[in-house]
Design a protein with these regions (language model features):
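Active-site proximal loop and beta-alpha junction motif in alpha/beta enzyme cores
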Residues: 1-55, 62-118
Length: 118
């Protein structure tokens, strides 16, 4: 959690954390903060992309799980992504301690292509 994702150095700090030796295969890095409107904003540095992406479903779910475990949110949260779109995450906890997450939001085709023979 950071004070304000809008001014966070997602590329620089994200790259540093992504390449930290603690994460042998690298890791995605999520930055989250309260928005002025009272909600939450999230930005993600993605491994493989090696930069910031407009949204990350797994990052949103992981962030919601952490916020929930820290007592920052209840079972449901909406996160405004770098694209400006909002994704919702619901965390359901069973009595035996199992957490199940569901993600909701808009999905879009952003690229189509054809691979030739390799």
């Amino acid at each position: 959690q950071v004070p304000d994702v809008a001014v966070s150095d997602v590329f620089g700090r994200g790259r540093t954390i992504r390449n930290d030796p603690s994460f042998a295969a690298g890791t995605n890095v999520n930055f989250v903060s309260h928005s002025r409107a009272g909600g939450w904003k999230i930005r993600t540095y993605e491994r493989g992309v090696e930069g910031e992406t407009l949204a990350c479903g797994t990052g949103s779910v992981a962030t919601a799980a952490l916020l929930s475990s820290w007592g920052e949110i209840g079972d449901d949260v909406e996160l405004e992504t770098a694209s400006g779109q909002v994704v919702g995450v619901r965390i359901d906890r069973s009595p035996d301690g199992v957490w199940k997450a569901s993600l909701r939001g808009e999905g879009r085709v952003v690229f189509e292509g054809t691979l030739g023979e390799i």
